[in-house]
Structure formats: structure tokens, C-alpha cells
């Protein structure tokens, strides 16, 4: 089997995301970005209307839908009409079940939940009924509080244990194991050293059999290491983290710079052909 790490392109329809807030709030601009990401080689586009950066304002589901729907409707219609590749997958980055339900109704393929089902008790039953792929990301606390929850005994072992707990809850809700992906949640309730430890420990996560989605793109820990405050100037640091993730068994990486990271994935797949999660 030839390894082919998948690329998830980021499309934030938010005014306050840490990297590209406000750039895609207009539906036409969001569609153009989706088309660009697809042309650059994204296998899946992750669309989000709720910023999850530290300290971000939390929206009610109704507010999130109001922000999301104009762009999402346009993107889904474009895929139906051939303005986007028919095989392009769409993911929704949300932790609200009503938002996920509406998106699935419109044709979204994946749900990417940074809360792993803890923020909305209706999410796991919804995903079970839909049968769609579901990303369980590790975090502690919320966007407002997660900086207070970086106290791990061993960050790799603790993240694995907590993802196992959420996976068990998902299984109990009727979600099938083959629907689930794990995301270690780089930057969410983790210090720089803990993020590095998680990248080093990815083979331990991969050993549990869930495909891994890893999202290091432009994260603060990269900026701290590079002493680079500008999120968009962290591409080379992101590239190094993407290589490390693939070497550790990541099956998919979530990135902003799809064209360059697609090349990096192809090269990393050739360098580490047997590390398939």
C-alpha cells in the first residue's frame, strides 16, 4: 500500500480567528478560497464559523448558523454544479449539534468537534445517526479557560487516556469505531513543550488504531519557538511540524497553506512510507 497523507484545508468564516480572521466572512470570498484550496490539492476543506483560539467569543448555535449558512450554502451549491470537484469532501468545525445537523442536511461530509462531544450532549447521537466521519479532538476546558488546564502527569499518556474516554462515550452513543478520528489537539490546553512532546509521542496515539488528524498549522507554539508573532510567517515551522506528524503516523494534516504543505506531505510520504496510521 502506497502511503498518501491527506490534506485538510482550513476555511475560517470568522472575524476573530488567530490566523486569518475576517478574510472569508463574505460568502463569495469564502467560495473563492474553497476553490483555491481545492485546486491546490486539498482532499477535504474544514469550514468553521466559531473561532476556537484562546479567549475567543463563544457563539450560540443560532449565531453560528447565521454566520455560517450564507457561505456554506454557496459552497455546497458550487460543488453540486461542478464549480468545485465532485469528490471534494467538506468538513464542519463545530461543537454545536444543531449547527452540525443543518450542515449535514446541506451535504457536509465530516464533523470536526474540538470538544469531542463534551460541549453538546446531542452531538454524539446525531453523528451516530448520520454515520459520518467524526473527529474527536483533545482539549481541556473551553477557549476561555483552557490555559488553566495544562497540568498533565504525562501529556502523551493523559491525552491518550482522555481520548479513549471520549471514544468510549462515542461508541456507547452508537458511533462506529470506523467513523472516528483522533486529533491530539495541538495548542489546546498545552504548553509549547507539551505540544512538542505530543508530536514526539504520536506513534503511541497511532498504536490505538484510530486514524490521526494533526493540526499544527501556524500555531502559537511554533511562533514561540521561532520568535515569530505573525501567524502567516510561520509556514516553515509548520512544514517541520507536518513532517514530524507524518513521521509519527498522521493520516491527515490540517493546514492553511495547502499548496506548499501538499508537496511536503508527498515528500514525507516517500521518506516515511511505512508509518501509516
Identify the function of each model-found stretch.
Residues 2, 15-36, 52-90, 94-98, ...:
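Active-site-adjacent loop and "lid" segments of alpha/beta metabolic enzymes
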Residues 4-9, 35-49:
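N-terminal glycine-rich anion-binding loops that anchor highly charged ligand groups
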Residues 87-88, 176-179:
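Short acidic capping loops at alpha-helix termini that bridge into adjacent secondary structure
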Amino acid at each position: 500500500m502506497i502511503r498518501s497523507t491527506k490534506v485538510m484545508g482550513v476555511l475560517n468564516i470568522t472575524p476573530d480567528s488567530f490566523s486569518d480572521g475576517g478574510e472569508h466572512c463574505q460568502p463569495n470570498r469564502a467560495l473563492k478560497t474553497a476553490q483555491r484550496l481545492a485546486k491546490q490539492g486539498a482532499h477535504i476543506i474544514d469550514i468553521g464559523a466559531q473561532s476556537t483560539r484562546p479567549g475567543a467569543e463563544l457563539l450560540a448555535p443560532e449565531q453560528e448558523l447565521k454566520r455560517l449558512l450564507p457561505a456554506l450554502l454557496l459552497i455546497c451549491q458550487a460543488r453540486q454544479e461542478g464549480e468545485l470537484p465532485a469528490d471534494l469532501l467538506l468538513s464542519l468545525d463545530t461543537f454545536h449539534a444543531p449547527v452540525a445537523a443543518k450542515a449535514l442536511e446541506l451535504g457536509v461530509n465530516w464533523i470536526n468537534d474540538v470538544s469531542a462531544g463534551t460541549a453538546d450532549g446531542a452531538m454524539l447521537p446525531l453523528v451516530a445517526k448520520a454515520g459520518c466521519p467524526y473527529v474527536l479532538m483533545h482539549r481541556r476546558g473551553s477557549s476561555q479557560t483552557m490555559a488553566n488546564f495544562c497540568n498533565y502527569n504525562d501529556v502523551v499518556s493523559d491525552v491518550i487516556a482522555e481520548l479513549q474516554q471520549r471514544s468510549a462515550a462515542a461508541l456507547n452513543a452508537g458511533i462506529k469505531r470506523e467513523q472516528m478520528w483522533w486529533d491530539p489537539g495541538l495548542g489546546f490546553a498545552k504548553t509549547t513543550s507539551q505540544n512538542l512532546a505530543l508530536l514526539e509521542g504520536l506513534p503511541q496515539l497511532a498504536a490505538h488504531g484510530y486514524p490521526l488528524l494533526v493540526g499544527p498549522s501556524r500555531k502559537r507554539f511554533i511562533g514561540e519557538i521561532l520568535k515569530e508573532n505573525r501567524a502567516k510567517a510561520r509556514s516553515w515551522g509548520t512544514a517541520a511540524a507536518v513532517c514530524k506528524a507524518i513521521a509519527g503516523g498522521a493520516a491527515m494534516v490540517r493546514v492553511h497553506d495547502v499548496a506548499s504543505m501538499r508537496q511536503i506531505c508527498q515528500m514525507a510520504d516517500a521518506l516515511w512510507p511505512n508509518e501509516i496510521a
